[in-house]
Amino acid sequence: MAKQKFDRSKPHCNVGTIGHVDHGKTTLTAAITKTLSTKGWADFRAYDQIDNAPEEKARGLTIAISHIEYQTETRHYAHIDCPGHADYIKNMITGAAQMDGAILVVSAPDGPMPQTREHVLLIHQVEVPAVVVALNKCDMMDDEELLELVELEVRELLTKNSFPGDEIPVVRVSAIKALECGCGKRECEWCGRIWKLMDAVDTYIPIPPRPVDKPFLMKVEDVFSIKGRGTVATGRVERGVIKGGDEVDLVGLHHEPRKIVVTSLEMFHKILDTAEPGDAVGLLLRGVEREDIERGMVLAKPGSIKPHVNAEAEVYVLSKDEGGRHTPFFNGYKPQFFFGTTDVTGEIHLPEGVEMVVPGDHVKMKISTIYPVAMEKGMRFAIREGGKTVGAGAISQVLA
């Protein structure tokens, strides 16, 4: 069968369901597809089709993720759902499936639980910009006052983690009832609530700025000099656009950022006018010697990113079964940090009261590198030892 053409007429947005185990994330995902399928905007995916998620590799980690596609009247969505708690943690930290917004599923009879709190903290740390709440299993709650108390508790949890808890939409649903009914009508007591939830997602989760609108960034992968022409740096454009004549900052590793000019761009030995995100390009640079630039540095829009040696990070430590360490590590552990294209030696500083980190843990820590690296909030990295990945991290705050 011929592949369908990707429809670009609706703006695209990435969302995911998050929340405590057994609060109904996967059932809700199934209910969303069932309801939208009545309009022809989704293929219905049953619970067990979503739950046996295929495994993916990201930064040396195996993560089980289900990718579901659906549309509403105004948007096209890619929706991710993970079967296990650890899969969510790993996905958020590695950014394997980036989320522009999250649907936080909280079971009304139970209220926020430990994993609810952990997920909310993490989406704040890795900069998921917006959240909509699905208060699930409302068919099991007769007491309106109790429902209001649970809603208040969820709002307080969001506020505590720097989200606007008072204004975030909280929609009361019963995923199982909507699935059982399946009529998909807006006036239906249960299917109508799924529509209400999707309306909230449509209006409250913003369409992300396209990478072309963000400040230019390219991590340098290789460098060579062309006799009589100058120095060429190659890499993949991560965000923003660049054209011949633009000034960029060369950031990281040994000295303060310095300004250089991109004289021309090439891709597959052809001259380019402009390069966009995803393009693997060679940039011909003026005002820089071959010796002054190396793999691991970045070229960026002037002033947009700075080199740092200290940062705070959220880190997931691989378990032994995932190919990680067999033993814990302690304060002062000195691994390699892999930022984009290079390994930098550094040191780990554990929070007060944390003696050691055991494989399989998710922990907040401070890291310091032996020389400055271009870092910014939300940036992902791997922790390596002896050439193998032992952890994955995301910068939650740059310090100095």
From Swiss-Prot:
Where do the record's region annotations for G3 lie?
81-84
Which EC class is this protein assigned?
hydrolase
Residues engaged in binding Mg(2+): 26
Entry's SUPFAM superfamilies? Answer: EF-Tu/eEF-1alpha/eIF2-gamma C-terminal domain, P-loop containing nucleoside triphosphate hydrolases, Translation proteins
Q: Where is this region: G5?
A: 174-176
Please state the Enzyme Commission number of this protein: 3.6.5.3
Q: Where is this region: G4?
A: 136-139
- Keywords linked to the UniProt accession: Cytoplasm, Elongation factor, GTP-binding, Hydrolase, Magnesium, Metal-binding, Nucleotide-binding, Protein biosynthesis
Residues that bind GTP, according to the entry? 19-26, 81-85, 136-139
Residue ranges of domain tr-type G in the record: 10-210
Stretches the record annotates as G1: 19-26
Q: Can you name a GO cellular component term? A: cytosol
**What PROSITE patterns is this protein classified in?**
G_TR_2 (PS51722)
One MF term from GO for this chain? Answer: translation elongation factor activity
Where is this protein localized, as stated in its record? Answer: Cytoplasm
- Ranges where the record places region G2: 60-64
Q: Which reaction does it catalyse?
A: GTP + H2O = GDP + phosphate + H(+)
Q: How does it assemble?
A: Monomer.
Q: Which family does it belong to?
A: Belongs to the TRAFAC class translation factor GTPase superfamily. Classic translation factor GTPase family. EF-Tu/EF-1A subfamily.
Function statement: GTP hydrolase that promotes the GTP-dependent binding of aminoacyl-tRNA to the A-site of ribosomes during protein biosynthesis.
- What is the protein named? Elongation factor Tu
The gene name reads: tuf
